[in-house]
Swiss-Prot record:
Claim: NAD is one of the keywords in the record: no
Membrane topology qualifier: Multi-pass membrane protein
Name of the gene this protein is made from: Gpr180
Signal peptide (UniProt feature, chain positions): 1-23
Species assigned in the record: Mus musculus
PANTHER family in UniProt: INTEGRAL MEMBRANE PROTEIN GPR180, INTIMAL THICKNESS RECEPTOR-RELATED
BP GO annotations: fat cell differentiation; G protein-coupled receptor signaling pathway; gene expression; generation of precursor metabolites and energy; lipid metabolic process; response to food; response to pheromone
Organism phylogeny: Eukaryota, Metazoa, Chordata, Craniata, Vertebrata
GO cellular component: membrane
Protein name (database record): Integral membrane protein GPR180
Membrane-spanning parts: 174-194, 206-226, 250-270, 285-305, 322-342, 361-381, 390-410
Subcellular localization(s) per the UniProt record: Membrane
Keyword terms of this UniProt record: Glycoprotein, Membrane, Signal, Transmembrane, Transmembrane helix
Keyword Glycoprotein applies: yes
Glycosylation-annotated residues: 111
């Protein structure tokens, strides 16, 4: 399956190119033409919280700003939506006049303290000047005004030094703890796992694929931590490393998807075609391989489509676009189909050992596929700024638990078969000789 691996890497790299404009230190230019075309140039948005949040804007060309009567307008996101949806609509000047906060840009640096309600709220920042609401057709003249804008929330001591918005707060600490857990776990179990893999046996290939997926998830957590550590200092982070974190995560998802599908499809198809006395194998049959490859390619295409459709670049796990909804539907369908297939295998299986094996495997599969749809439904009951964090943290933890379940399952059975010196023909899972010699995704 080397070609499948190359396809996965190509798709994930193409859809997760470094994203710009995601930091809370914003750099750009105030443009009279852009402000006039849109009746207010959108600069950015931020989830402020606390009583001492700060907006700091710096410019160099003060004379041009004064000549243009440059101003910044801050709207609460909900109020801004009401203005856009109001009927009859407000004129340009009436809309700007309803801004909750206004800053007249007349100095090199302006600091605006945002007094906030107890609950965090999203604020949108717009630029406008004397040319923005004019009715004449003459194009606005004059230079653009380069700016740097820093958006800060209060830290634990109440000082406006936190670059993280309410939507992102706590993720830095979460990824630090996650990386720490991965490191400690590796120190404890890496040697024994390596020895188990060196011994070979019927679980060898599965453990290799599962370990690769786990290493990709650990690399994603480390890249996220590095990006957020830099982000906490300058509000920009390292977009390339942040994008690599998503690449690693998606590659891990595809790796696990192919593993789970290959195992389950192989078992169910072989069960239908062979007598029940024959062992269930991870056979490289055209049917099982074709189904797995088709679903993996489908998920990869949906992930690529989602990145082009979701311009707001939310968390990779919080699917908000049409493609994201299709991904959720795909996961639900996979969980149901694999669950039904395994249920059929379990009901006709006479061996208690095999039944226990399949039941535990089914639990890991269902948890892996259904955690994201379930958390997405639960997140509806929470505030908007809490949803991305809930889904991101919940999916990572649930999938980690699913991988632990699968690791315990395969390692325990590998040890049992080794100690018992059972023939591979009697095992509930073997790998055919033709399949063993092939590289697996």
């Amino acid at each position: 399956m080397g070609g499948l691996r190359l396809l996965a890497v190509a798709l994930t790299c193409s859809c997760w190119w470094p994203q710009g404009g995601q930091g809370k230190t914003l750099r750009g230019s105030f443009s009279s033409a852009a402000a006039r075309d849109a009746q207010g140039q959108s600069i950015g948005h931020f989830e402020f919280h606390g009583d001492h949040a700060l907006l700091c804007v710096r410019i160099n060309n003060v004379a041009v700003a004064v000549g243009k009567e440059a101003k910044l307008y801050l709207f609460q996101a909900q109020e801004w939506l009401k203005l856009l949806e109001s009927s009859p609509g407000y004129s340009c000047s009436e809309r700007l006049a309803r801004a909750q906060l206004t800053v007249t840009v007349t100095q090199t640096e302006h600091n605006l303290t945002v007094s906030q309600l107890p609950a965090p709220q999203t604020w949108r920042v717009f630029y406008a000047d004397k040319f923005t609401c004019r009715d004449d057709s003459e194009s606005p003249q004059g230079e653009e005004i380069p700016f740097e804008m820093v958006l800060l929330n209060p830290d634990a001591e109440g000082n406006p030094l936190d670059h993280f918005s309410a939507r992102e707060s706590g993720l830095h600490e979460f990824f630090f703890l996650l990386v720490l857990v991965y490191f400690v776990t590796a120190c404890i179990y890496a040697q024994s796992l390596w020895q188990a893999m060196k011994k070979g046996g019927p679980m060898h290939t599965i453990l290799k694929v599962l370990t690769t997926a786990l290493l990709l998830q650990a690399a994603s957590a480390l890249a996220n931590y590095i990006h957020l550590s830099r982000y906490s200092r300058d509000g920009l982070g390292v977009p390339l490393i942040g994008s690599l974190a998503e690449v690693f995560d998606i590659a891990s998802q595809i790796q696990m998807l192919y593993l789970l599908l290959s195992l389950c499809m192989g078992w169910t198809i072989v069960r239908m075609k062979k007598s029940q006395s024959r062992p269930l194998q991870w056979d490289s049959t055209p049917a099982s391989t074709g189904i797995a490859v088709f679903i993996v390619i489908t998920q990869s295409i949906l992930l690529l489509w989602e990145q082009f459709e979701d311009t707001s670049h939310h968390s990779a796990h919080s699917h908000r676009s049409l493609a994201g909804l299709l991904l959720i539907v795909l996961r639900i369908c996979l969980a149901l189909s694999l669950g039904c297939g395994l249920y059929q295998v379990i009901t006709v299986e006479r061996s208690a050992l095999k039944r226990e094996f399949y039941i535990t495997f089914a639990k890991g599969c269902i948890l892996w596929f259904l955690c994201q749809p379930a958390l997405a439904c639960i997140a509806v009951a929470f505030n908007d700024y809490q949803r991305d964090k809930l889904i991101t943290v919940g999916v990572i933890l649930c999938q980690a638990v699913a991988m632990v379940i699968l690791y315990r399952l395969f390692l325990s059975h590998s040890l049992y078969w080794e100690v018992s010196s059972l023939s591979s023909v009697t095992l509930p899972l073997t790998i055919s000789s033709a399949h063993r010699g092939r590289p697996h995704f």
